[in-house]
Amino acid sequence: MSFFPELYFNVDNGYLEGLVRGLKAGVLSQADYLNLVQCETLEDLKLHLQSTDYGNFLANEASPLTVSVIDDRLKEKMVVEFRHMRNHAYEPLASFLDFITYSYMIDNVILLITGTLHQRSIAELVPKCHPLGSFEQMEAVNIAQTPAELYNAILVDTPLAAFFQDCISEQDLDEMNIEIIRNTLYKAYLESFYKFCTLLGGTTADAMCPILEFEADRRAFIITINSFGTELSKEDRAKLFPHCGRLYPEGLAQLARADDYEQVKNVADYYPEYKLLFEGAGSNPGDKTLEDRFFEHEVKLNKLAFLNQFHFGVFYAFVKLKEQECRNIVWIAECIAQRHRAKIDNYIPIF
């Protein structure tokens, strides 16, 4: 069997890999974006999107069109495509696709807790959640007053339970604790997903490990930068860093000691690809933000996943590229709706 793994890969997964590569061919090109940024109204945008693989996905929407409606329909289309693949997947691809949804579940839980903290109703918050991360117990999140209650009453029967072990405490849920929970969940999630991919091995591990290593390192950089000027201690900050990136262990130890942005940048200098990202970012008008530089690098890594065949990385890469495409379209739509065209070109090109 080990001599021709691609033969056995295709038995269970060949149809879906062919499907996802076909869907990837419909990702918007640079020429499509050049057309979109020339639109004067959202109706023009709708018309241009009809000539792409999006087709008439906005056909049933009444005028006047809004950015939030476009955003909702983009997510719906992406979720329909993803669920079709999940419904036809055999193990271990089914578990791999489930792992992709867990990050959206984490974001949804945090959004609901934060909204509840600010006295927003659950009925108002649930529509704002990402449909790829929906789960049955979501609407009960508002009853939890502490992380322990959140776990015991709601999350214990969800896939997130495995990531929640380090978050359980009797402290009240305030904004600082919620951010700590978010980052602790993501740390456990990324480390678990990384371990799963290494166990799958082969081309899947070759494609996915660099992507997840970058995601872990990006979170470590952002956690460090966002912690400056807050009450978060250096010891607590270090506990939030995922240990599956290229920064582990020396880089993370240096980030744990960092006191300002320059010291974070000095850590990045030891890693050539991260050094380039920090050097290309600035805070002056016209400069790209560090977040944009991270998004660009993420797109580059996800595109690389399509260079090899017979692996699961293409499914993750497709979802992330579509997610970036949705952000791009919404950004352009916002600029058109607000008549703020000066920054309309600040999207992240994909192809």
Curated annotation (Swiss-Prot):
GO BP terms, alphabetized: cellular response to increased oxygen levels; cilium assembly; intracellular iron ion homeostasis; proton transmembrane transport; regulation of macroautophagy; synaptic vesicle lumen acidification; vacuolar acidification; vacuolar transport
Compartment list: Membrane; Lysosome membrane; Cytoplasmic vesicle, Clathrin-coated vesicle membrane
Superkingdom field: Eukaryota
Record's keyword annotation contains GTP-binding: no
Membrane topology label: Peripheral membrane protein
One Gene Ontology cellular component annotation held by this UniProt entry: extracellular exosome
Keywords for the protein's UniProt record, in alphabetical order: Cilium biogenesis/degradation, Cytoplasmic vesicle, Hydrogen ion transport, Ion transport, Lysosome, Membrane, Phosphoprotein, Transport
Modified residues (Phosphoserine): S283
GO molecular function, one term: protein-containing complex binding
Tissue: Ubiquitous.
Pfam families, per database record: vATP-synt_AC39
Functional note: Subunit of the V0 complex of vacuolar(H+)-ATPase (V-ATPase), a multisubunit enzyme composed of a peripheral complex (V1) that hydrolyzes ATP and a membrane integral complex (V0) that translocates protons. V-ATPase is responsible for acidifying and maintaining the pH of intracellular compartments and in some cell types, is targeted to the plasma membrane, where it is responsible for acidifying the extracellular environment. May play a role in coupling of proton transport and ATP hydrolysis.
Subunit structure of this chain's protein: V-ATPase is a heteromultimeric enzyme made up of two complexes: the ATP-hydrolytic V1 complex and the proton translocation V0 complex. The V1 complex consists of three catalytic AB heterodimers that form a heterohexamer, three peripheral stalks each consisting of EG heterodimers, one central rotor including subunits D and F, and the regulatory subunits C and H. The proton translocation complex V0 consists of the proton transport subunit a, a ring of proteolipid subunits c9c'', rotary subunit d, subunits e and f, and the accessory subunits ATP6AP1/Ac45 and ATP6AP2/PRR.
Membership in a protein family: Belongs to the V-ATPase V0D/AC39 subunit family.
Protein name: V-type proton ATPase subunit d 1
Organism: Homo sapiens
Organismal lineage: Eukaryota, Metazoa, Chordata, Craniata, Vertebrata
Gene: ATP6V0D1
